[in-house]
Regions:
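Dynamic "connector" segments at or just before major functional cores
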Residues: 1-212, 216-222, 246-264, 499-537
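Electropositive, glycine- and tryptophan-enriched low-complexity nucleic-acid-binding patches
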Residues: 238-280
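An anionic, glycine-rich sequence signature occurring as long contiguous blocks
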Residues: 240, 260, 306-419, 489-537
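Basic, amphipathic alpha-helical segments enriched in Lys/Arg and hydrophobic/aromatic residues
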Residues: 445-468
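Short amphipathic alpha-helical "interface-anchor" segments enriched in bulky aromatics
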Residues: 415-443
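Short, flexible loop/turn motifs enriched in small residues
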Residues: 16-21, 236-242, 397-399, 425-426
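Acidic, metal-coordinating catalytic cores used for nucleic-acid/nucleotide bond scission
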Residues: 266, 289-299, 313-315, 448-449
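Short helix/loop capping segments that flank catalytic or ligand/cofactor-binding pockets
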Residues: 32-33, 147-153, 163-165, 220-223, ...
Length: 537
């Protein structure tokens, strides 16, 4: 049976714990050891907040679980919320929000989310107040931090959200294990996407045609990533990979489904399984795909699915042959174009691949090719000098050479690359799962937590897309960075049941009024929680 091992616990005159730490410890039977047993720390509970007289239960500020109650007799954890009677003194763990906080950015974002219908989607998917408040706190942080490294608890503490989302313990937001595990549950994923799809279908009855996207692997520098698998997809050496599959609405590019899969299961059967899951769960049709080279085989090339994919550099595909075909033309200006700050060579061909006539788009990214060549000549000069002339020619293009294969209608090389990148770049939003995981101990890199992080990123992406749509509809040139920067100058202070806003600057007022909103003189907190956020308490 486990027990709580407390260390250096000190109490004040009233008996309240003022310092100390604790761990959950198991006793194991070990034949031949002293006392035939050995103690093993199962989990560190962190700082002691309250501890029962018998030492068998208490409240702790866990580095991985946040504020939590642990009972050794039942070996169970329970979250601690404001007003649930667990703590005798809640003032230290649920401090009152600051009197003077930033209001403009959070109020503008919440106004956009309400008018766009996303708040209603979230209320439908997460009907419990505690779940919705915690989700909104993390959503505000992810969108408003705009690339900065400010932590969630710090941003919320100095924002009007600390008053509007009073049911959330601000210190618990720093390492919110419970939130990401709850978001990683399949029920949360299905509830959100069903609610989102219902809202999109209500706004546009023709909604229902989607694109399957899996063009690049997730970052593989997490050694303990539970999805990682050793794999190769025909473009380079084998590596440990996990992959993110997205299903995007064709018209808006909004994600309506995702899967995280090991890198070694990438093939047409994975595509078929995801199509079936999406159809059965959401009632939408996946009619096209943007794919990495690992998916390309005879079944895909000869099938009915419309696709755009990278050609693998393996037997049966004219990868190297296409290089020899275009080599004399690579430096001709008529085939050059620029995308994303890179100069490209691009040509279109129609060739038979795996018995099926296909469109091939051959490219050389001049910047990437030059960088790779420079690295080879610097790091391995003897190897480069010993190459044959034809191999040196190939080395000059190798780092930037790639081929796209498609059965869609013919496009220009620039158009095909735009079609590929426009879908692929949506994935890049989710490649930073490691940003959250770096804040957590290795024990927190679980499959459930990672799925929860991806779902959270999907929700944040939908929110940012709604912001961009609102700005575009208003005909304004403002970026999200501009919106949050200019409106964060608007401060407020608490006066009884209301937040009283200061006089906004001219630029702040322009942002609100330009998007169709008025800057309120004051906000009744209870009414705002009830009418705007849809909270029942």
């Amino acid at each position: 049976m486990p027990f709580i091992k407390a260390q250096k616990v000190r109490r004040d005159e009233s008996g309240r714990v003022v310092s100390g730490s604790a761990s959950v410890v198991d006793t194991e039977y070990v034949p031949g050891a002293r006392y035939h047993s050995r103690q093993r720390v199962r989990e560190r509970l962190g700082r002691v907040v309250e501890l029962a007289e018998d030492g068998r239960s208490g409240v702790f500020r866990s580095p991985t679980r946040g504020l939590v109650r642990y009972d050794a007799d039942t070996d169970s954890f329970e979250p601690v919320e404001r007003g649930d009677g667990t703590l005798d003194d809640e003032s230290s763990e649920f401090p009152e929000p600051s009197a003077h906080v930033v209001a403009g950015d959070s109020l503008l974002l919440l106004s956009i989310l309400e008018s766009s219908g996303l708040l209603a989607v979230l209320r439908s998917a997460f009907p419990k107040d505690a779940e919705l408040e915690r989700l909104l706190a993390h959503l505000l942080h992810s969108v408003l931090r705009d690339g900065s490294r400010v932590s969630c608890d710090d941003l919320v503490a100095r924002s009007a959200a600390s008053h509007l989302l009073a049911g959330v313990s601000v210190p618990s937001l720093r390492s919110d294990s419970a939130y990401f595990h709850a978001m990683g549950d399949d029920r949360a994923k299905v509830a959100f996407f069903r609610s989102l799809v219902d809202a999109m279908r209500a706004a546009d009855p023709s909604f229902g045609t989607c694109c399957y996207v899996d063009s690049t692997p997730l970052p593989n520098d997490l050694a303990d990533n539970p999805f990682n698998a050793f794999s190769s997809h025909g473009l380079g050496e084998a590596a440990v990979q996990s992959r993110l599959v997205l299903v995007l609405d064709d018209a808006t590019g909004i994600p309506v489904w995702y899967e995280v899969i090991p890198g070694n299961v990438v093939d047409v059967s994975t595509l078929a399984r995801v199509r079936e899951d999406v159809g059965a769960t959401l009632g939408v049709t996946v009619s096209s795909a943007v794919l990495d080279a690992g998916y390309v085989n005879r079944e895909l090339v000869g099938g009915d699915m419309r696709y755009l994919a990278r050609m693998p550099a393996r037997r049966g595909y004219p990868f190297k042959t296409m290089w020899h075909d275009v080599k004399p033309q690579v430096n001709r200006g008529k085939y050059a174009f620029v995308r994303g700050g890179h100069a490209y060579f691009g040509r279109h061909f129609v060739r038979e691949v795996q018995g099926t006539e296909s469109h091939l788009y051959v490219y050389v990214d001049k910047e990437n090719a030059l960088s790779c060549l420079r690295q080879t000549m610097t790091d391995r000069p003897e190897e480069y000098e010993a190459m044959l002339e034809r191999d040196k020619d190939w080395e000059q293009a190798r780092g930037g050479f790639f081929v796209l294969i498609s059965n869609m209608d013919e496009m220009t090389p620039a158009g095909a690359l735009d079609a590929y990148f426009s879908r692929m770049e949506v994935e890049q939003v989710f490649k930073t799962a490691k940003d959250h995981l770096r804040l957590l101990p290795i024990a927190k890199w679980t499959e459930t937590a990672m799925r929860g992080k991806v779902l959270h990123d999907v929700i944040c992406t939908v929110a940012v897309l709604r912001v961009r749509k609102a700005v575009a509809a208003a005909g304004r040139p403002w970026s999200p960075t501009d919106l949050w920067g200019k409106t964060s100058s608007l401060m407020c202070f608490r006066n009884g049941p209301s937040l009283v806003l200061e006089t906004p600057s001219r630029q702040c007022r322009q942002r609100f009024e330009g998007l169709g909103y008025k800057v309120p003189a004051k906000v009744d907190v209870a009414a705002y929680r009830r009418d705007v956020l849809g909270l029942r308490s």
